[in-house]
Amino acid sequence: MSEDPHHIPAGGDDLPAAVRREIAAHHALYARSPEAAHMWDPIVIGVPGGPVPCLLLHHVGRKSAQRLNSILQYYRHDDDIVIVASKGGLPHHPVWYLNLLAEPACAVQIGAFHSDAVARTLAGAERASWWQRVTAEQPVQLEYQARTTREIPLIKLELRTPAPRRSGPA
């Protein structure tokens, strides 16, 4: 999947306007200065936990077939990258996750680094192990899970090219 400098933020129509504005501003910052956008403090949308590492996920709309982008916090252990489809504990999955279910081929940008990837939803013991890591790093994910009856999906991004090591919590 080749890089496209023009991005269309995916979904989020059911999020509050202030949250959508902050996410749009973060998209714009990623376009201008990907290294500056890599670390982001979600307190601007009311989520505690301090600055978190964010990636830009490039995926294809399952209905529109358009190339879409979503900025997401990610979690890293060794060379593994995982994203969480919590959507703040809303009752339905985020659009980007539904798109990945329909077409797992995607691309990832972490700062200035780019790689094609394949998305895979974690299950069983692998999911349980990652859920412990995720909630240790971001306890708010436990609150999100408590708000919804759906099991919050954890998605491993299997990168074609391993991401370089970064400083900070990533």
Predicted regions, residues:
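Short beta-strand segments
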Residues: 51-86
